[in-house]
Amino acid sequence: MMAAAFMIAGGIGSVLRFWLGNVLMAMIPRPRIPVSVMVINILGSFALGIFISLGIDNQTVSIVVGTGFFGGFTTFSTFSVEAVQLLAAKRVKASAVYILLTMAGSIGGFWAGSMLIP
C-alpha cells in the first residue's frame, strides 16, 4: 500500500514540476540560465522545509510526501544536465551562476521553510 502511495505522490510531484516548468518557460522564454528548474528546486526545498518542520510522526506520510512528492517535484538530475550543458557550450560564467544560485537558493529555501513553523 505504501509503495502505491509513494508512486502516486511521486507522479503527482513530477506532473506538477512539468506543468510549472512549462509555465515558467512561457513567462521567461529566453533566460540566460535554466530558470525553471532553478525556481522549482528552490520552491520544492522551501516547501519541504515547511513539511519537515511540521514534525509529522507518521513515517508513511513522511516517506510518501517527503520523498515521494517532493522527490518527484524537485530534480537534481536535470539541474546537473543543464549545468554540464552550459559548460559544454563554453558558458562557464552562466554555469557557475546557475550552480551557485540553485545550490544556495535550495539550501536557503529549505532553511527558510523550516523556520516558518516554530
UniProtKB/Swiss-Prot annotation:
Residue intervals passing through the bilayer: 1-21, 36-56, 61-81, 97-117
Reaction(s) catalysed (UniProt annotation): fluoride(in) = fluoride(out)
Amino-acid positions noted as binding Na(+) in the UniProt annotation, renumbered to this chain: 71, 74
GO cellular component: plasma membrane
InterPro entries: FluC
Positions of disulphide bridges: none
Protein's membrane topology: Multi-pass membrane protein
Localization per Swiss-Prot or TrEMBL: Cell membrane
GO biological process terms, semicolon-separated: cellular detoxification of fluoride
Superkingdom, natural source: Bacteria
Activity regulation, per record: Na(+) is not transported, but it plays an essential structural role and its presence is essential for fluoride channel function.
Biological role: Fluoride-specific ion channel. Important for reducing fluoride concentration in the cell, thus reducing its toxicity.
Similarity comment: Belongs to the fluoride channel Fluc/FEX (TC 1.A.43) family.
Protein name: Fluoride-specific ion channel FluC 1
Organism, as annotated: Bacillus licheniformis (strain ATCC 14580 / DSM 13 / JCM 2505 / CCUG 7422 / NBRC 12200 / NCIMB 9375 / NCTC 10341 / NRRL NRS-1264 / Gibson 46)
